[in-house]
């Protein structure tokens, strides 16, 4: 289960068919794992079924609405009528029986618009699942409160924030995605969907992984701007409790600004002008998941990057050698990890869930990370031992301080590119 309050630190001191984005060189998976990312965009949208949507500048848009619906937004106290249209993907078979699915999307949602993404699968036993809601999303928060949907669980699967996980003994042989675009009735604006995809995986339970040998990215360090989340500790607590929990948007903003994209001064005019690193606060607000009550919803972060004009999706990587392929081509990678303070030398904290940016590798092959869990921007750059880092990122099971067994990220990454 994903931990609420992701990135809150326990301090002791303080591949793929259909995917065009940033595909790394082909690799063979370990014998015990399978990972796939598949994406529909541009011309590949023609393979799906349209109802009320059409092709326009930048992607799919509402053209002749399929219908209208009244939507009540409890957090805003509003009920509005929205026109809508849908796109449903063809069935996609990933080539193995999957136990997890994480959807990602890139879209523009101007005022008075939003979208909903759903997924369903066909199990290896031949049963078709229900449609599960993977997120209701808008780049802003004036029309809806972007949210994951709690309480989705049945005999086949359950949804934990952003991750569809099958029940014991159930696997997905194939899946479909569906997106519904909404615009307020009478509004001339429309949301625009530029891409929709999903990562599927079957990664076995493992407490440890074999350390890879240093590869092609030795001695490469990308100039990713460093931002520290702890500068914002206790600030703007309405967004997940404050900066101490903002590892995900801080990491996402670092990569966005590496690519030369950031919110405009006008977009940040609600933040005091003399506040340090204002873009981090903006990123926190615009990744905040109102049901999860935090900023660590993975696809909400890549969707935020896309709202700045970039492209992003969630996937898993097999190991550090695969990650090195991205660094060698100038692409920083955001990784998810969880660990005890004793498991990562130099961190000075333990965490049930944390995001940081891999920006390079030393000549010896150790990991150079921009770790946002720092007291100042000048202390963000950190070198971590290769074997320790690979373990805490790749494992799917771990022991907590009390000795209990908890989950691990299994190689999850955010990939964000121009």
Report residues per predicted region.
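Secretory targeting and sorting signals
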Residues: 1-25
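Extracellular beta-rich ligand/substrate-recognition surface
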Residues: 69-84, 313-317
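Active-site-adjacent structural segments surrounding the nucleophilic cysteine of cysteine proteases
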Residues: 180-294
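Beta-sandwich interaction modules
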Residues: 29-54, 79-99, 107-194
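Noncatalytic regulatory segments and standalone regulatory/sensor domains
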Residues: 34-75, 93-96, 128-131, 169-226, ...
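Histidine-centered active-site/metal-ligand motif
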Residues: 113, 247, 354
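Conserved active-site-adjacent core of cysteine acyl-enzyme catalytic domains
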Residues: 273-418
């Amino acid at each position: 289960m994903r931990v609420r309050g992701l990135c809150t630190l326990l301090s002791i001191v303080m591949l793929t068919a259909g995917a065009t984005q940033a595909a790394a060189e082909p690799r063979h998976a370990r014998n015990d794992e399978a990972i796939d990312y598949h994406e529909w965009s541009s011309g590949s949208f023609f393979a799906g079924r349209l109802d009320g949507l059409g092709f326009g500048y930048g992607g799919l848009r509402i053209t002749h609405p399929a219908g209208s619906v009244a939507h009540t937004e409890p957090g805003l106290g509003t009920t509005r009528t929205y026109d809508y249209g849908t796109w449903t993907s063809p069935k996609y078979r990933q080539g193995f029986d999957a136990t997890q699915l994480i959807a990602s999307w890139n879209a523009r949602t101007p005022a008075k618009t939003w979208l909903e993404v759903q997924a369903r699968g066909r199990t290896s036993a031949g049963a078709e699942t229900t449609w599960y809601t993977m997120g209701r999303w808008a780049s802003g928060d004036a029309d809806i409160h972007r949210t994951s949907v709690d309480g989705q669980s049945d005999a086949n699967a359950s949804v934990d924030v952003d991750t569809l996980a099958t029940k014991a003994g159930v696997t997905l042989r194939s899946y479909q995605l569906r997106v519904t675009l909404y615009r307020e009735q009478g509004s001339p604006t429309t949301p625009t969907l530029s891409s929709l995809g999903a990562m599927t995986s079957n990664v076995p339970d493992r407490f440890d992984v074999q350390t890879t040998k240093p590869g092609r990215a030795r001695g490469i360090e990308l100039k990713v701007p460093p931002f520290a989340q702890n500068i914002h500790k206790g600030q703007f607590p309405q967004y997940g409790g404050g900066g101490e929990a903002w590892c995900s948007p801080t990491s996402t903003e670092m990569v966005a600004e590496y690519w030369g994209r950031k919110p405009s001064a006008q977009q940040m005019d609600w933040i005091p002008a003399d506040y340090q690193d204002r873009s981090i606060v903006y990123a926190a607000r615009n990744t905040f998941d109102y049901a999860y009550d935090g900023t660590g919803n993975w696809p909400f972060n890549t969707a935020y990057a896309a709202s700045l004009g970039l492209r992003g999706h969630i996937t898993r990587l097999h190991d550090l050698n695969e990650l090195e392929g991205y660094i060698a081509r100038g692409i920083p990678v955001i990784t998810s990890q969880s660990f005890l303070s004793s498991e990562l030398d130099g961190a000075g904290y333990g965490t049930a869930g944390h995001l940081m940016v891999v920006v390079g590798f030393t000549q010896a092959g150790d990991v150079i990370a921009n770790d946002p869990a720092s007291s100042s921007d000048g202390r963000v750059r950190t070198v971590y031992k290769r074997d320790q880092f690979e373990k805490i990122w790749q494992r799917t099971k771990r022991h907590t301080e009390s000795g209990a067994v908890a989950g691990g990220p299994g190689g999850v990454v955010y990939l964000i590119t121009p």
